[in-house]
Amino acid sequence: RRVLFRLGCSDVDPIMGVEVDPKDGFRAIGEPKALIQHNCDKYGWEVPGKNNEEPSQGWNEGPCVLKHNGRYYLQYAAPGTQYRIYGDGNYVGDNPLGPFEYVEDNPFSFKPGGFIGGAGHGHTFKDKYGNYWHVASMTISVRHWFERRLGLFPVVVSEKYGMYALTTFADYPFWIPDRKVDFEKEDISMGWNLLSYKKKISSSSYLEGYEPELANDEQVETWWAAQTGNAGEWLQIDLGKTMEVNAIQVNF
């Protein structure tokens, strides 16, 4: 067995790869090889900025490799973890250290909208039933530039459409399969709709800038905060009519 190491986290340097010897302190065998160069001039999703508008190079980072049907998918993230447009792309090759070919429908993992955005710096893995999933970083970036959460997305690996993560309805509950599932054909959504969005809301108290209306505006970057952390503080939402409630999701 060979042990291969990929590295890179830079707005200048490329994603690199090298074989290492685990029996000798993971010493490099040979010289590191450049695997992915920066290509902001070719691939707009690698351009940094809230809407990919900044005149600079993005950060290519978080490389990992998935082997599927004898081919190697070299995954990487761009352009920066603080953006909702943060995503993951693929290069594909026949050898673990390349050469690799860019996949034209990149990014394969991308979620700029919804309650929480971002789907980059991730890794694709297979569960015990043979289903592929992608776990990725999602941004908040309010209290700290790198304030994040993790998202989990089902992945389709298709002969026709290649590899892509299903992020469209990722804000809503889905069931975790206990069998092999064709995500391209079978919907694992629970089918539950959002009931609380911008409904009438009140609270026992609030801090300025953290009003109760910010608790159900479907933006992870805003929230309600009571004046104290004492018992007895409360938040109330009026749905306007009797509704069936299947689940309550609290984000904190």
Task: Label the predicted regions.
Residues 2-4:
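Short, small-residue-biased leader/transition segments that mark boundaries at the very start
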Residues 10-13, 79-82, 140-142:
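Short glycine/acidic-enriched loop and turn motifs that connect beta-strands
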Residues 12-13, 18, 22, 26-38, ...:
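Beta-propeller fold recognition
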Residues 22-56, 91-114, 160-170:
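Blade-edge beta-strand/turn elements of extracellular beta-propeller
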Residues 57-101, 109:
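Loop/turn-rich, solvent-exposed surfaces of beta-rich toroidal or solenoidal domains
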Residues 70-72, 129-132:
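Short coil/turn segments that connect the beta-strands within blades of beta-propeller domains
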Residues 177-242:
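Disordered, acidic Ser/Thr/Pro-rich linker "stalks" and the adjacent N-terminal cap
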Residues 243-252:
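A short beta-strand element within beta-rich, extracytoplasmic domains
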